[in-house]
Amino acid sequence: MDQSTPKPHAETNSKDIWHPGERCLAPSPDNEKLCEASIKSITVDENGKSFAVILYSNFQERRVPLKRLQEVKSVKDCSRNFIFDDEDLEKPYFPDRKFPSSAVPFQLSENGDSIPYTINRYLRDYQREGAQFLYGHFIQGRGCILGDDMGLGKTVQVISFLAAVLGKKGTREDIENNMPEFLLRNMKKDPPSTAKKMFLIVAPLSVLYNWKDELDTWGYFRVTILHGNKKDSELIRVKQRKCEIALTTYETLRLCLDELNSLEWSAVIVDEAHRIKNPKARVTEIMKALRCNVRIGLTGTILQNNMKELWCVMDWAVPGLLGSRIHFKKQFSDPVEHGQRHTATKRELATGRKAMQRLARKMSGWFLRRTKTLIKDQLPKKEDRMVYCSLTDFQKAVYQTVLETEDVSLILQSSEPCTCNSGQKRRNCCYKTNSQGETVKTLYFSYLAVLQKVANHVALLQTASTSRQQETLIKRICDQVFSRFPDFVQKSKDAAFETLSDPKYSGKMKVLQQLLNHCRKNKDKVLLFSFSTKLLDVLQQYCMASGLDYRRLDGSTKSEERIKIVKEFNSTQDVNICLVSTMAGGLGLNFVGANVVVLFDPTWNPANDLQAIDRAYRIGQCRDVKVLRLISLGTVEEIMYLRQVYKQQLHCVVVGSENAKRYFEAVQGSKEHQGELFGVYNLFKLRSQGSCLTRDILEREGKVEAGIMTATTWLKEEPPVHKLETAREPDCREHRGPEQLAEAACDLCSDFSEDETASNSVTKTVKNKASDSSRASVSPGQFSLLQCGFSKLFETKCETVEDGDENIASDNESSDEQPTCFSTEAKNAGCQKSQDSLGTLKHQKLANVLNPNGKCVFEKSEKILKENIPSESDDEKNFKNTVDHHHILQNVTESEDSDIIFPTQYTTQRFLKKNIRFKPPVDGSEDSESENPVNIKNNGDDTKTNVRGNGLISKQLNLEIETLKSNTKRKGGSDISDESDDIEVFCKSRVRKQRATSSLRFKRKKENKRELYTFPKTMKKANQQCATDEDCNSQTIDDFSSSDDNLSVGHISFSKQNHRPKTIKDKISVSSKLTNHKRNSTFIPRKPMKFSNESVVNQNRICESMDKFLDGVQEVAYIHSNQNVIGSSKAENHMSRWAARDVFELKQFSQLPANIAVCTSKTHKEKMKGDISTRTKECQPLSEGSISFPLYISHPVSQKKKKVCRIDQTTFIIGETPKGIRRKQFEEMASYFKLSSVKEFAKRVTNATSEERQKMLRDFYTSQYPEVREFFVDSPSECTKSASEKGERVENKSEKRQSLMKEQPSDSETLSFKNSTKKISPIFSPSICKKKSIKFQNHSSCKKKVLSNDVETKKLPISCTQETDGGERSQASEGTAASCSLNSKSGADELGKLENAGKGQQDLTSLGISRNGPIFQVENKTIENPVLEDTSVVGLLGDTSILDDLFKSHENSPTQLPKKVLSGSIEKAKQRPKDFWDILNDQNDDSLSKLTDLAVIETLCEKVPFAASSKRKEDLEASLWKSNEKFLWKKFNSSDTDESTANTQE
């Protein structure tokens, strides 16, 4: 029934005679309920039945039989006790709201207590659950805490509980029951027989009357307020039990404690229970003195500062639940807080997490908390950003002057030993007070307030109405400070109003001035919060001076005036700004008309700021809300914000039982761990040079998270056999230099340098440029959070193309001299670290990422390009290629400082749309002046352009391309979901992390979409363009989404070298200096990047956004999103699990830093070794298809093919089949080959040879599509080898590689890249290349530099080989993981082809090509003979494999000295220091004479990467010099080496 329509009273019998115009009760046309209407006319039908035409109140007419009409009875004739029907008097009554649920009571117990249906129909499920929780504890006579987030309706839940307990019905019955007894007797109705219950509700005064209003709204409660003048009379009524609920304040409770204790309360309900947080406070003592067992606390922030507060609140509600305070501190508080340190050891972290879980279990039955995620679907989007504003020069001078005062010096030295040698601290001995007699503690708070004022606006120091206590102090400070600035003093005297409102005296005011102008243009309505009313005065005067129509609300505003202000602001368009005091406007106000919230200054308590934000961000808000928190850079305000983060993270751990991210080294209250946050030295300090402590801390955590997440995903990607050596994780990092390893070993605990952080974050353009050179000093290869996109800190869902465009641009922007795709690629290759190159995107798989020096030769096939993108111009295609590649590499090469990098889940479709064939340069150069020409050919016109660029660029490009190709291969076999097929490069990072994250936007895109397609003809032009964009957009923030799972942000690492301008044509040939193995690969991506008109429109919108606007504000130094700073992360979850396992289960690594991932127990490793050994013996030919574990293939894949072919209207995608289709086709294959189950078919595939698998694929696919038979054409017969021989050779190579890995920790990088290059060497016949068959043997295990052709080598024991290989892969993880996966659709198919082509490759590798050997120029349609060129190298140098130990280490180095090229076609690699090979290849006496210089020799040897231990390092150096005894010409016996390798491995 429509509740808004009262039900008139009618007689039981209908009236006999009706007349037109009479009032009557007629059935409603909507629901047939009787409602009042009038008779318009009366008619009789042909059957003699009488009908009345009824006119309803809504002017509807209806023909109704007269018999159905009833007479309206006057109210005066009704009996006294039936004045209204139940439905008329129901509470709550919301006429404009529909009932969310059915009108039935909610049973709380079997004895009949229930929430009345009048209330229940408006409740949400979680609110019913909360009422049930309260009722359960009430019945059992014990207390509890309801800790729901703000805005979830704790008040309504309590009222529902009270209604159930008090037996309320929400109808007329409650009215009658509330009547005095004498009236009930007159009505001949017995009073209720149930015992009367009384409840006491204690609330802050600010919400006391709000409770009264809510109780009156939701039910018929007899409520009295014990406060103010009437509290004595009301107290008498309470003693007479004439009320059911008594409302009072904390202060009144203190005054009337004895009277209230004399009463018997059914329960005490305390709102804002976090006020009971200090055990020594008077309010806590009063609350604990209340005589009531059922104590119910309501608080959304039970822990605001430290865990002691939590204990205090819980101990009040449930005395003794958490033990004594000392017990709680020892068992819970200390372990949790110390385990939350960024530098915590595994034991500290594991102990802290275990204590967290124990605490959660203890509190679970007594504490109920839900968060706003329950109602997120009813809330709009919220963007929360921290805006760091630079101080003006005047502010800096004043701030520094305050810090240099004698009083501040007294504060800073107060904890030092007294000069009188008494052994006491200065503040307790001779320096208790200053010259004015003020104690150090008083000075501490006074000067802290002064610094806060200066950080906001210098004019605040001269404002009147200062408290008497500080008046003298402030005057003295002003005299001392402003004595240096007489102009300011004089001006403020002459024109105080102008001075206060002039933004030039405040960096924040400058930002606010432009922000308000921007909001006024966009018709945004702004809520401007400030904690200080004096600051509100300044802001008010500024609004007056600017002619802004504003409203102001603070503590002095009367309650009725508040309602008027809120209504005017929400409804009036002209009023677009409201100045609100943070404390006064924090509760009970509904500013849903505002869509921009500006917090001008932070508070120490995060709850205050959150309450202020919730004034606009709440149910009822229709627009997306933007929250901007202004922070003065480098001042005490930054410490205030970071302490908020510290407290919120601690709250997440203790209250939310989350593995909260560990940002800080500090522990509150600990003298030993004051870290970055606590102690007077952190507060009374001005960070200069524009450095941002917040950025440093967030980036530090981000780098650790990136390493951990890549380590985690790597371990997932690797089959368990590969995890056998995971405990040797330092070996994984040995490929980095000693500095990097030391940094990783200390868990990245130290703050990074300002230069480094400047380049890691999105700062202003000037800072970025300044940091470019310093960035190169960072050891390459370590990746930050941004590059892998793992931390919730900065990233979110990647949705729009426009973000991708921006990231592309930001990539270009990030290197001053390399705007093309080489910039990022080069960086990664220059890293030359297995882990680092590995630590690419989360979306990539780990193929040959570990191959830092690999020669990847990318072959572009014109034919394939035409098939894939026939309609696009060459320029467009080329731009897409470079852009797509650039996108991926942006993330791959993110940061050079990450902790552990093991990438996984790489994808490829966004890679180069055109196959670009890259040849690594022959030499590297450390000298930025020396350049190597990079041959870039355009297939279309056969023009060849020499591009000047650092070898590091080309080398990294090779590495990255190799990585992506092998990642593509990896993808085939591992069951990565289809979502990972697309590399989400459109990272919406709101964090202004590195210049990569700055998401440089192509501004020209707005005017001409074509420019996005057209890549600059020369790199120089691109540099100019990027520089322009960088200047304008270095701080642009992308749209942010608060998703925790979709995290990927680009991060650019910078190089010291000046990257020369490059020209990009359709075909790019890049050379890189390599070791013996060379690889050839041709790669075709699935998807080009699309720049649509829609993306241009979106781009235009973003350009007009507030983010774009803020980016152009000069005073904005840094912006980061606050969206995902608070809370846990997947990386932290992994670290916590690993720590708990290592400490409590495996009893190992307990003192290692928790941020180091050491995995897998020894017993597990031995078990897995045994399993693998047994299985490999069974599957004697180590075929690529043999799969030992779900999702993974146990042995290296010899090759993987990625290909897209189009025949007529059908497109065949080879090697990139989506996961779901692969699974389906695998099942179809099982049926096709008449096998009983998929498992049986899998075993058959596992045991089959390469030819057999290829035949199976051919038979299956040709049965459905005969035209694909041509895809299975074998390579020339002379190259054919049996699959089993291939498999054995893979084992040998794996074993040799393993031995090298064990002896030489740093060799894994060089070998890994050699692995890729060997397999990609251009050995294939031209005919194969022309057919676009993508051939590369991705033997990730073939890291051995010299692979003999002897048959004996091929016949080594498989089990032994696999064992060594497994251990090797676990460390390096390079190509193995990627090569380990075989696409069930195309893996075997391509395997056969490439194995046939492998014989020539084997001949090539058996020659032992040196790392400096010439690189072969391979054109698109002409293949030079690499064997001939290789022979020339052998003729010059002979078998150089014996020097592998000596020269391997320098492949890890980021740079190379220049050296001469042996032939014109050879190109140099740069960014790598010179080693012996470089000197030998320099055919001049000067270079060779360097070998006689002992200093040069020592320098070369010192560049060996820091090993996992000093012992390993000594062994390494010893092996280097011992290897020289054999020198160049001694032949290498592969079988002997394999045996020695195995022994070394043992």
Curated annotation (Swiss-Prot):
One of its GO terms (cellular component) is mitochondrion. It is an enzyme of class 3 (hydrolase). Its EC number is 3.6.4.-. It is found in: Nucleus; Cytoplasm, Cytoskeleton, Microtubule organizing center, Centrosome; Mitochondrion; Chromosome, Centromere. Residues 511-661 form the Helicase C-terminal domain. ATP binds at residues 148-155. Residues 8-22, 1283-1300 have a biased composition (Basic and acidic residues). Phosphorylated by NEK6. The modification Phosphoserine is found at residues 977, 980, 1370, 1373. The keyword DNA damage applies. A motif (Atypical PIP-box) lies at residues 780-791. The keyword DNA repair applies. GO terms for molecular function: ATP binding; DNA binding; helicase activity; hydrolase activity. Residues 1-22, 918-949, 1279-1314, 1361-1382 are annotated as: Disordered. GO terms for biological process: DNA damage response; interstrand cross-link repair. Belongs to the SNF2/RAD54 helicase family. Promotes double-strand break (DSB) end-joining and facilitates programmed recombination by controlling how DNA ends are joined in a spatially oriented manner during repair. Also plays a role in DNA repair by restricting DNA end resection in double strand break (DSB) repair. Facilitates replication of complex DNA regions and regulates the maintenance of chromatin structure. PANTHER family: DNA EXCISION REPAIR PROTEIN ERCC-6-RELATED, SNF2/RAD54 FAMILY MEMBER. The atypical PIP-box motif mediates interaction with PCNA. This is DNA excision repair protein ERCC-6-like 2. It comes from Bos taurus. The gene is ERCC6L2.
